[in-house]
Every structure is written in C-alpha cells, then in structure tokens.
Amino acid sequence: MAIDAFLGKWCLISSEGFDEYMKELGVGMAMRKMGSMAKPDVYIIKDGDTITVKTESTFKTSQFSFKLGEKFEENTLDGRKTQTLVSLKDDGSLIQEQEWDGKKTIITRKLVDGQLVVECDMNGIKCVRVYQKA
C-alpha cells in the first residue's frame, strides 16, 4: 500500500487511553484535559516526496513535514522537541518514532476498513484513536 491511501482529511471519531498515554509522555494535567476534550481533524498532504501531517483542533493547530526514512526534528503539540523518523512498512502501516531526552514513543497509523487507526505506545502504555475520512 502506498502513502497515497493515507492522504486527505480525517476526523476523530473515537479515542481510548489517550489521557494515560499523555501522562506517560509527561504532559501536564491542564494540557491533558484540553487534549482529551479536543476532537481534532488531521490532514495528510503530499507534495512531491514531502509529506505533511497537520492536526487542527479548537485549542491548537500543529503540523510537521517529513520525507519517508529521513530523521527530522519535530516540535510536538505538547511542546517536546523530538528526533523523529517516519517509515512505511511492508504491511502498509506508517510508523512514526519519536525520541527525546532518552525516551521513545512509537505512533503507528494504519488503514482498517476505510478508517485511519492511530496506535500510540510508550513504555507499554497504549492509546488507540480512530479517524473517519471526511
């Protein structure tokens, strides 16, 4: 499966374990409350071999751009500066690995029955967020 299958606008329809995952990341309580309440739209855009992921909510908008397989510095929504690598696996999943201060989290995006399923994992604390194509 090519990256093109991920392109478009995606709207959050369900979220499980997000508060616990944000806590494991080190996100403060006020920002966790806002993050848990937000129903973000995610835009995945491709321009040549550069891919941009833009997350928009009523609270905050952020975006990052990358080329598959090339490490880059990402400024996350919660204020972390990470070294990030995004790769497309043979099974069609998009794997985003963030490293900072000796810590690591892995965000896996995959398409399941036409929905974008985002699985986040840090130290075994997992969350699953499901998006419907707009």
Swiss-Prot record:
<keyword id="KW-0963">Cytoplasm</keyword>
<dbReference type="GO" id="GO:0006869">
    <property type="term" value="P:lipid transport"/>
</dbReference>
<feature type="binding site">
    <location>
        <position position="109"/>
    </location>
    <ligand>
        <name>N-eicosanoyl ethanolamine</name>
    </ligand>
</feature>
<dbReference type="GO" id="GO:0005634">
    <property type="term" value="C:nucleus"/>
</dbReference>
<feature type="binding site">
    <location>
        <begin position="129"/>
        <end position="131"/>
    </location>
    <ligand>
        <name>hexadecanoate</name>
    </ligand>
</feature>
<keyword id="KW-0813">Transport</keyword>
<keyword id="KW-0964">Secreted</keyword>
<dbReference type="GO" id="GO:0008289">
    <property type="term" value="F:lipid binding"/>
</dbReference>
<comment type="function">
    <text>Intracellular carrier for long-chain fatty acids and related active lipids, such as endocannabinoids, that regulate the metabolism and actions of the ligands they bind. In addition to the cytosolic transport, selectively delivers specific fatty acids from the cytosol to the nucleus, wherein they activate nuclear receptors. Delivers retinoic acid to the nuclear receptor peroxisome proliferator-activated receptor delta; which promotes proliferation and survival. May also serve as a synaptic carrier of endocannabinoid at central synapses and thus controls retrograde endocannabinoid signaling.</text>
</comment>
<dbReference type="InterPro" id="IPR031259">
    <property type="entry name" value="ILBP"/>
</dbReference>
<keyword id="KW-0539">Nucleus</keyword>
<dbReference type="InterPro" id="IPR000463">
    <property type="entry name" value="Fatty_acid-bd"/>
</dbReference>
<keyword id="KW-0446">Lipid-binding</keyword>
<dbReference type="GO" id="GO:0005576">
    <property type="term" value="C:extracellular region"/>
</dbReference>
<dbReference type="Pfam" id="PF00061">
    <property type="entry name" value="Lipocalin"/>
</dbReference>
<comment type="similarity">
    <text>Belongs to the calycin superfamily. Fatty-acid binding protein (FABP) family.</text>
</comment>
<protein>
    <recommendedName>
        <fullName>Fatty acid-binding protein 5</fullName>
    </recommendedName>
</protein>
<dbReference type="InterPro" id="IPR012674">
    <property type="entry name" value="Calycin"/>
</dbReference>
<dbReference type="InterPro" id="IPR000566">
    <property type="entry name" value="Lipocln_cytosolic_FA-bd_dom"/>
</dbReference>
<dbReference type="GO" id="GO:0005737">
    <property type="term" value="C:cytoplasm"/>
</dbReference>
<feature type="binding site">
    <location>
        <begin position="129"/>
        <end position="131"/>
    </location>
    <ligand>
        <name>(9Z,12Z)-octadecadienoate</name>
    </ligand>
</feature>
<feature type="binding site">
    <location>
        <position position="109"/>
    </location>
    <ligand>
        <name>hexadecanoate</name>
    </ligand>
</feature>
<feature type="binding site">
    <location>
        <position position="131"/>
    </location>
    <ligand>
        <name>N-eicosanoyl ethanolamine</name>
    </ligand>
</feature>
<dbReference type="GO" id="GO:0014069">
    <property type="term" value="C:postsynaptic density"/>
</dbReference>
<keyword id="KW-0770">Synapse</keyword>
<keyword id="KW-0445">Lipid transport</keyword>
<feature type="short sequence motif" description="Nuclear localization signal">
    <location>
        <begin position="23"/>
        <end position="33"/>
    </location>
</feature>
<comment type="subunit">
    <text>Monomer.</text>
</comment>
